[in-house]
Amino acid sequence: MNPVLQNILTRRSVRAFTDKKISREDLNLILKAGIYAPSGMNKQTWQFTVIQNQNKIQELAKAIGKSLKRDANYNFYGPDTIILLSNEKDNSNGLADCSSALQNIFLMANELGIGSCWINQLKTICDELEIRSLLNSYGIPENHIVWGIAVLGYPEKPNEIKPKNESVIKFVD
């Protein structure tokens, strides 16, 4: 099978991670894959904010959980690393740009044996006082919205490959 297709077919969202740390070398490869994603008119107005400090990860998870009235133990599934992808609020391509970058991140992580999951709840609560204060402290510009968070870590168990619904494909003659 084509190795690119094999990587796409085996990538799954991982929601349970081990304590193993991601090396800086692997993290740099993942980030390089992300920044090489397409962006509208190649403007590359996004920002990739990497957090490996567990206290900061839990601080953000707790604030998001509180805002969304989630379980007190909300923790992004216990990843080693998170990458917040943000873009200018007035950029009409911001969501698409960050989504493309996230997919590249997920595929590169999968290729390296690193699990990932897309956390998307932050986009609607970025400007709540507590959340914005944290984002500012992480260096995310005031005029940015966080379109997604890539949570990364080594999977606790192997990915289960499930078939997808291929009936959604329609050809027009």
Report the location of each language-model feature.
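Acidic, surface-exposed loops and disordered segments
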Residues: 1-173
